[in-house]
Regions:
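N-terminal pre-ligand scaffold of iron-sulfur
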Residues: 2-81, 94-95, 99, 112-130
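Short cysteine clusters
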Residues: 66, 86-88
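Short Gly/Pro-enriched turn/cap motifs at secondary-structure boundaries
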Residues: 106-109
Length: 130
């Protein structure tokens, strides 16, 4: 796994900031623990951002592109419960921590999901990359 703070070489640094009103129907699932939502607003992340409520008013936000190769037509992660799966190699990641599940033991370096900042203010969730 990469050292803390080291960014992924396959995914570019995309600066963005988006505010999600949790009262709106599109984001209401985020009011419940364990319900992920995909944000596909243009300019938010490389291929979008998955956001999940992890409990106790804490949220996690992750890039929707697979972190283990350059973005392409199959690299958009597909939602599977509280996990996401790469359409290219089938790599699976948990949205609670961003960690890759069943990491191959072949000596190659594998990356966990690229994380973004998420802060809750009243009923508005700000997701951003400074």
């Amino acid at each position: 796994t990469p050292e803390y703070g080291q960014r992924n070489p396959y995914l570019q640094e995309v600066r963005f900031s988006v505010e999600l009103n949790l009262n709106l129907p599109a984001y209401a699932p985020l009011q419940q623990v364990g319900n992920p939502v995909l944000i596909t607003t243009t300019g938010v992340g490389t291929q979008g951002v998955y956001v999940i409520n992890t409990g106790f008013d804490q949220f996690r936000a992750f890039e929707a592109a697979c972190p283990n190769h350059a973005p392409n037509t199959c690299s958009l992660l597909k939602l599977s419960g509280q996990n996401v799966v790469c359409g290219c190699e089938g790599y699976t990641y948990t949205l609670f921590t961003g960690q890759m599940l069943e990491r191959p033991n072949d000596g190659k370096r594998y990356y966990d999901l690229l994380s973004y900042q998420a802060e809750l203010f009243a009923n508005t969730l700000r997701v951003y990359q400074p």
